[in-house]
Structure formats: C-alpha cells, structure tokens
Amino acid sequence: MACSTSCSHAGATFTRTIASAMPASNMASQNWEDFNYPPLLNLWHYAPHELEQGPRFVARTLHAALLLAMLALVCNLLVNIGVVVAGFSHAIHIMYAFFNLLLATLIGMWTTMECGYKGMATNKPKLMRRYLWVWGLLTLAMAAASLLALINFNGWGRVASLLATPADPTVQTFWVVGSVIESSVWTLACVVSTVAWTMIFRANRDGPAALRWYAGSRR
C-alpha cells in the first residue's frame, strides 16, 4: 500500500511538472514592462489577447469580476447621493461611499492584475495564492453587501425594509429601485467573482493544464 501511495504521489507530481512546463513559455511571453492598465494611469500590464484561448478566457473573467465590483460601488455612491439629497440620510454616507469606491478599486485592481492575472499568466503560485486570499475576502464582502442593509450599503435586506416601512412615495420609489439595482449588481459581482476565484484555485492547484479545460469549454 505504501508503494502504491508513493507511486501515485510521484505520478501526480510528474504530471503537474510536465503540464506546467508545456504552456509556460507561451503564457510568460507577454511584455510586462508595457504598462497599459487602467487607461491613462497605466499601472499594470493587461493584454489577454496575447494569451492562449484558455488563459485568455480566465483573464477576461477576472477582469469582468473586477468591473462588476466597481460598478456596484458606483451604484452605491449614486444611490447614497440621491437619498442624501432627499434628506433621508446624512451627507457623511456620500463620503463613505466615495472612499469605499476609491479604496476598493485600488485593492481590486492590484489583486486582479498584479496577483490573479499575472500569477495565472506566468504560473506563479505565490501570486495566485495571494489573489485567492484577498479576492476571497472581497467576495465575502460582496455577498454581505448584496444581502444586508449595512451602514450605507443597499442590499436585498434594504429592499425588504423599505417595502415594509411607509415613507414619502417619491423618495421610497427612488430608494427601492436604486436598492434593487445595487443589490442585483452586487449579486452578479459575487457570482462572477466566485467563478473567477474558482478558476484561479484550479490553476494554482493543478497548474496550467487546468486552463486548457476553459479553452475546450469555449469551442
């Protein structure tokens, strides 16, 4: 039995080593000194078209998760501005929403581009593990924002609370509609982020060979 276990472990290690070596040259061929993302700021290199089909699909999924999270934060800011202007909330919530957008965008971009995208494209487990930790926590935060009425976040709990509490019809309609939109975007961001997290988890666990599955799924 010990021999069988040892052989199995050796076989798995050999398979991962070979799989890692095969596509590594293609994925690492990008010019990482060509900083082109985000537009105008140019802090990171992002060129999914330079990757093979499987890694390209993963890269775009990671990017979609980032953009959806940013869109949810923009929705949160706009809803808070409307509610504050209507006199149903304190102006400080606008400041909270703005700083949430700024801070989360910076953390999200760094995590996605420097850790997830670069780690996957160059097959560096350290970067991918960093992405898994940080983006995993951010995904949990997105789930909370989509479900609860936390401080100035308008999740599905806010929708239920507003519908159960009589208020000025005009303001309530705006707040309910805004909360439904914000909650929906948070929910979608959470789902796509979970998919992106799973992709990087598989790439970190199984090596570049795991990315070929996504190429096959796109045919």
What does each of the following model-derived ranges do?
Residues 1-54:
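Extended, low-complexity, polar regulatory segments
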Residues 55-82, 89-111, 115-219:
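Eukaryotic polytopic
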